[in-house]
UniProtKB/Swiss-Prot annotation:
Residues 118-167 form the bHLH domain. It comes from Arabidopsis thaliana. This is Transcription factor IND. The gene is IND. The keyword Mitochondrion does not apply. InterPro entries: bHLH_dom, HLH_DNA-bd_sf, IND-like.
Length: 198
C-alpha cells in the first residue's frame, strides 16, 4: 500500500531512501548554519572587530594625519571654483586675460549728473567725495571684469569674485612652470598650461 502510494505521487523507492539518508547525514547537519550563529551581540567589541582590525587601529603608523592648512585652503578654493565655474565662463575668462585693459581713471567716462544744488556743508562734501571715489573704482572694475559693463553693481561684484578665483588658480598653475624658464610673457601660454593640467 505504501509502495503504491509513493508510486502514485511519482516518487520512487530509491529517491525516498536517498532522501532519508541525506536527512540523517552528519556532514549535512554540520554544514547547515545554526540560528544562534546568525545572531550578534552588538555590545561586544569582539563581534564587531577582529583582533587583527583592533591591532591595525591601535598601530600608530596607520593613523591618518591631517593635511597642512595651506592644502585645505587650496582644496576649498578648488571646490568652490568647480561649483561656480563652467566651461563657457572659463573660456570667456581666458579670452579676457589676453585682452589689454585700460584702467586709467581719466579715460573712464563719468555718468551724467542732473542739475542739483550742491551743499557746501563740510560733512556733505566729504561724503560726496567718498561716494565719487567708490563710483570711480566700480566703473574701473566694470572695465576689468569680463562683461561687467553690461551688469548692475551687485552682479558685477559677484562676477569679480569668480574672476579673481580664476586668476588665482592660473597663478598657482603657472608658478611651477615659471621656475623652469617658460616664456610667461606670451599670454597664449595661459590656455596651454591650463589645458595641460589633469
Amino acid at each position: 500500500m505504501e509502495n503504491g502510494m509513493y508510486k502514485k505521487k511519482g516518487v520512487c523507492d530509491s529517491c525516498v531512501s536517498s532522501k532519508s539518508r541525506s536527512n540523517h547525514s552528519p556532514k549535512r547537519s554540520m554544514m547547515e548554519p545554526q540560528p544562534h550563529h546568525l545572531l550578534m551581540d552588538w555590545n561586544k567589541a569582539n563581534d564587531l572587530l577582529t583582533q587583527e582590525h583592533a591591532a591595525f587601529l591601535n598601530d600608530p603608523h596607520h593613523l591618518m594625519l591631517d593635511p597642512p592648512p595651506e592644502t585645505l585652503i587650496h582644496l576649498d578654493e578648488d571646490e568652490e571654483y568647480d561649483e561656480d565655474m563652467d566651461a563657457m565662463k572659463e573660456m570667456q575668462y581666458m579670452i579676457a586675460v589676453m585682452q589689454p585693459v585700460d584702467i586709467d581713471p581719466a579715460t573712464v567716462p563719468k555718468p551724467n549728473r542732473r542739475n542739483v544744488r550742491i551743499s557746501d556743508d563740510p560733512q556733505t562734501v566729504v561724503a560726496r567725495r567718498r561716494r565719487e571715489r567708490i563710483s570711480e573704482k566700480i566703473r574701473i572694475l566694470k572695465r576689468i571684469v569680463p562683461g561687467g559693463a553690461k551688469m548692475d553693481t551687485a552682479s558685477m561684484l559677484d562676477e569679480a569674485i569668480r574672476y579673481t578665483k580664476f586668476l588665482k588658480r592660473q597663478v598657482r598653475i603657472l608658478q611651477p612652470h615659471s621656475q623652469i624658464g617658460a616664456p610667461m610673457a606670451n599670454p597664449s601660454y595661459l590656455c596651454y598650461y591650463h589645458n595641460s593640467q589633469p
